[in-house]
Amino acid sequence: MSDFPLYALSEEHQAIREAVRSVCDAKVAPYAADVDENARYPREAAEALQAADFHAPHVPEEYGGAGADALATVLVIEEVARACVSASLIPAVNKLGSLPVMLSGSEELKKHYLG
């Protein structure tokens, strides 16, 4: 490993990673095997991510989201995947599905679907 890192996460991004990891280790990982073995929706993960506001971190603050940048959103997805790959689709699909509304939706649609 080099003494001169070409890239390092900012303190803010490190804090996000640690916070997501903590939630996932405690509330997502314990159910991962059961989710996979029974091919079921990761309800426990969805509830934990929503309670911690990690289910859709990219949603702008004016609609009740965290307004996370792309790197923070990827860090959330990565940490959730570390605990349960199936559950990582929750923030990933929220990002993918909400992007058209964020980019082209009317204010009414944004308030309804993002808020």
How should these model regions be labeled?
Residues 1-12:
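Intrinsic disorder at enzyme termini
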Residues 12-26:
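A non-catalytic, amphipathic alpha-helix used as a structural packing/dimerization or gating element
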Residues 28-115:
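Glycine-rich flavin
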